[in-house]
């Protein structure tokens, strides 16, 4: 099980990302825009740099909902490989069966 502080940190990052997502997208479109004047582009770069680091989507790490494990994560189920296997074996994940050939 991951430390509670690590899980809390990820929750904080998700909240910050949600709060600043729209503003970050607007600033990035200004920066990437071909017709944007240089002064406005530089101001947008500075404004983007002043946003909190944890508000960037790349700072987020996918974690298992049950254990908080960061590796072996399956997006489709929101679980780590260990807990996914346990849930599948108990029949809690509909439509998923153990491979047999």
UniProtKB/Swiss-Prot annotation:
PANTHER family: 30S RIBOSOMAL PROTEIN S14 (PTHR19836), SMALL RIBOSOMAL SUBUNIT PROTEIN US14M (PTHR19836:SF19). Part of the 30S ribosomal subunit. Contacts proteins S3 and S10. GO terms for cellular component: cytoplasm; small ribosomal subunit. Belongs to the universal ribosomal protein uS14 family. This is Small ribosomal subunit protein uS14. The keyword Ribonucleoprotein applies. GO terms for biological process: translation. Keywords: Ribonucleoprotein, Ribosomal protein, RNA-binding, rRNA-binding. The keyword Magnesium does not apply. GO terms for molecular function: rRNA binding; structural constituent of ribosome. It holds the Pfam family Ribosomal_S14. Binds 16S rRNA, required for the assembly of 30S particles and may also be responsible for determining the conformation of the 16S rRNA at the A site.
